[in-house]
Each structure stands twice: as C-alpha cells, then as structure tokens.
C-alpha cells in the first residue's frame, strides 16, 4: 500500500484521538466500584461522556503507547524486546506515574520493571517462566501497543511482530496474542473499514488454538446468531469467559471478549463501538481505548463525533520522568508517528512529513482538519452598548472547517459554543488547507 502523506497522517491522527476518546469515556466507570449492573442502572444507554473533565489526568493506557514507542528514538532498525525494555527504564519514575505500581507479583508492569532493574533481561522479564502464567496474561499485553499499529499501516503481520516484541517485556502467552491481535487490527484498518476483515486480520496473527482466538470466535458466532442484542452477548461472556474463570487483577481474556463484542455490535460506527465497550464494564478505559484506536483509523476524522472529539482539544497529559514530554500535542505527535511509519518501511520521509516534525521546537501549523493544538480562545470584550445584536467579530486562522466560536456575556465570563460551523470561509495563505473564519459574537450566544 502506497502511503500518501496527508491521508496517512490523518488516519494516525484519527486513531490516536480515538484511543484517547475511549480512555476518557471509560475511565470514570472502571472497576472495582463500577460493575456492569451499576453502569447500566446509573447511566443506562451511554451516548456521551459520563464525566465532564476540565483537565483529564494522565492515564497508563496513553502513557504506554507513547513512551514505549520511544525505543525507536534510541535504537535503529526493527524494534526488539530489549530496546523497548530500555525505554521502560529510561522514561519511568519508579513508583510514580506511567503505570500501576501495585507491587511485585501483583502488578504485571511493576513486576517487569523490578525484574529489569535487577538485571533480568527482556523478554525473560515478562515471561511465564519468570513470573507465572497468571501474571503474564493480564490485560497490559494489549493496552500499550496501539502506536505499533499506527506506525505500521496496512501490514498486519509486521505490526503484530513489533507488538509481540514490545509486549514481551512484561507479558507472555495470551498476553502476547492480545498484543498481536490489536496491533494487526489497527494496521488493517488503514486499508479497510470492514469490521470482519479487520478482525480476520487480527486472528490471522495468533494461533487458532489459543484461548484468545477462541473467545473472539465465540463472540463472533454469538453475534451472527443474535445480531441485535449486545447485552445478551455480554451475559454470555460473563457466564462462559468471566473474571471468575481467570486469575489476577485484570486478565486479558474476558476483556478480549469485550473488545470483540464492541467491534461486532458497534457495526463500524466509532461512537457506538466505544460506548458499548464502556457499558460492558470490566476494564472500561482499556477496552474502549483499544477499539477506539481501531475504529478511529477505520472511520477517519469524519467519523469522530464532535461531542467526543472537542473536549480532547488535541492535548493529553502524560506522567513519564521527562517533564517536557508530558504535555503531548496530538497533531504534532501524529506527524512524528507518520515519520516513523516511513522510516520503518525503509522509505524516504516525504518533506511534507519531515518538515512538520520540529525537534526541540513548539510548532503548530493547523494543517490537519479541525486541529486546535490545545489552544483555547475566548472573547473578553463587554457587549456592544446600544447595538441591536451586541455583535462582535472574531477572525482567526483555523484548521479545516470544524470550528469553535466564543462570546462573552455582560459579566465578562467567556461562554463557548464548540463545534459551530463558521458562517463563511475563504482560503488563507499556504498551506491551502488553512481557512479564515469570521465568527459573529453575540452577548447571548455564539452565532457562526
């Protein structure tokens, strides 16, 4: 598959946004406080964020995909388990942030970290032989590998190989099958939005006799027989593949079933897929994050509803040891991932991509549709005295055609009307994808 730069980076951008939308949606209803029944009885049919965050805190499901991929910054060639292990040691503060420090023999990641620190090399650090089968097959095998799928588009086998190597630092057995499955699905989503084809590509990268393949196929078979009742499928998972059958804090197999269920019953719709993954309970932010990446790539930017995308505002917070890396601008990171995608294919990086990755520099070009780069604007002027409409105009350079307009009431407190469509557009200076929008500001509402 030839990579057209703008099309490729927009898919990356959509996938990474999708991952973070899923994480943000699922995080407030994680276990152990939130059971399936409590989520159902409290929120019913979820169709939007259940918690309105002004600032969403760092989450391990975003930390891992960002920091473990930084092995590519320090090691040339195909990623190896030991290269990723060094990223673990280089970017984590022991006991603080990045992932769950739950204790040796309890938290898979904490156990692997201490193994590495004490001189146990990867992949032995995450092996069943070293840590036991239960610990090695927890959900972390698949929740930290989304970016490996994003940098290997339309090549599921290679994406799965990279993901297995990365996940083997801390996981083994079914944990590695989960890594391969999710990364392969993400990679396949660059060339098709067909959910069956995407899941087939994931299954092709894991042993047919594996428990992971069995739970995915069980869900698909149930869906074929009961295509309209995802809650019945969730009941089947509880009865036949539930937490009572698998040890540890958060085993990968029940959650693999949720990911498969959400993709089947979401039927290619981004929002419905992450919503179902969240309503299924168990590891809600992990599962919604994984399927959010897959569906984000498959559906593209146009498939991400504004009420989910806007609150992300192109910015996430991380919790690694390097403070300057902990505020991540998503559009800039998408260009960085695209650069790695070309490099890993052994192809020259197009100037359209390399020119937008500015090492050691803050650079916002707003070339990706709807990008905000984390910026917030608010009018602070008082209403126009004696004006029939109290109208103000704000003019600025905006990315794409999806805009936010702001107004200030008499009290001077900004009110935002996000996802408004600007009244008029005209092409701005290069690049041609920039548009100039004029937003009419009213004291009572924002009219665009």
Show which residues each predicted segment covers.
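Structured, active/binding-site neighborhoods that engage oxygen-rich ligands
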Residues: 1-448
């Amino acid at each position: 598959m030839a990579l057209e730069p703008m099309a490729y980076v927009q898919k990356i951008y959509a996938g990474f946004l999708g991952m973070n939308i899923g994480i943000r949606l699922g995080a407030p209803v994680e276990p152990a406080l939130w059971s399936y029944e409590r989520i159902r009885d409290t929120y019913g049919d979820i169709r939007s964020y259940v918690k309105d965050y002004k600032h969403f805190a760092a989450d391990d499901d975003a930390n891992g995909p960002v920091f473990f991929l930084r092995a590519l910054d320090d090691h040339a060639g195909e990623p190896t388990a030991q290269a990723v292990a060094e990223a673990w040691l280089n970017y984590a503060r022991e006991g603080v942030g990045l992932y769950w420090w739950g204790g040796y023999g309890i938290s898979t990641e904490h156990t692997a970290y201490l193994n590495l620190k004490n001189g146990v090399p990867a992949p032995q650090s995450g092996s069943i032989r070293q840590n036991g089968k239960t610990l090695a097959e927890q959900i972390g095998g698949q929740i930290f590998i989304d970016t490996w799928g994003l940098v290997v588009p339309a090549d599921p086998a290679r994406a799965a190989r990279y993901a297995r190597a990365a996940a083997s630092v801390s996981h083994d057995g079914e944990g590695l099958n989960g890594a391969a499955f999710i990364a392969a699905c993400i990679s396949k989503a660059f060339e098709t939005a067909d959910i069956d084809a995407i899941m087939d590509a994931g299954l092709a990268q894991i042993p047919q006799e594996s428990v992971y393949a069995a739970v995915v196929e069980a869900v698909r078979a149930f869906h074929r027989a009961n295509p309209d009742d995802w809650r019945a499928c969730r009941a089947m998972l509880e009865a036949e593949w539930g937490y009572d059958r698998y040890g540890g804090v958060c085993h990968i197999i029940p959650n693999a079933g949720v990911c498969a269920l959400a993709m089947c019953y979401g039927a290619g719709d981004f929002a419905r897929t992450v919503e179902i993954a969240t309503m299924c309970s168990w590891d809600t932010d992990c599962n919604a994050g994984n399927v959010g990446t897959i569906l984000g790539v498959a559906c593209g930017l146009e498939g991400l509803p504004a009420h989910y995308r806007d609150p992300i505002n192109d910015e996430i917070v991380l919790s690694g040891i390097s403070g300057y890396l902990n505020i991540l601008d998503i559009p800039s990171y998408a260009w960085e991932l695209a650069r790695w995608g070309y490099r890993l294919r052994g192809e020259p990086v197009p100037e359209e991509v390399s020119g937008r990755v500015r090492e050691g520099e803050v650079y916002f070009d707003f070339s990706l549709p709807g990008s905000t780069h984390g910026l917030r604007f608010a009018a602070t002027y008082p209403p126009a005295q004696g004006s029939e409409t109290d109208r103000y105009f704000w003019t600025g350079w905006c990315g794409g055609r999806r805009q936010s307009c702001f107004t200030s009431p008499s009290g001077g407190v900004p009110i935002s009307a996000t996802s408004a469509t600007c009244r008029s557009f005209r092409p701005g200076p290069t690049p041609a994808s920039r548009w100039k929008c004029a937003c009419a500001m009213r004291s009572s509402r924002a009219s665009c």
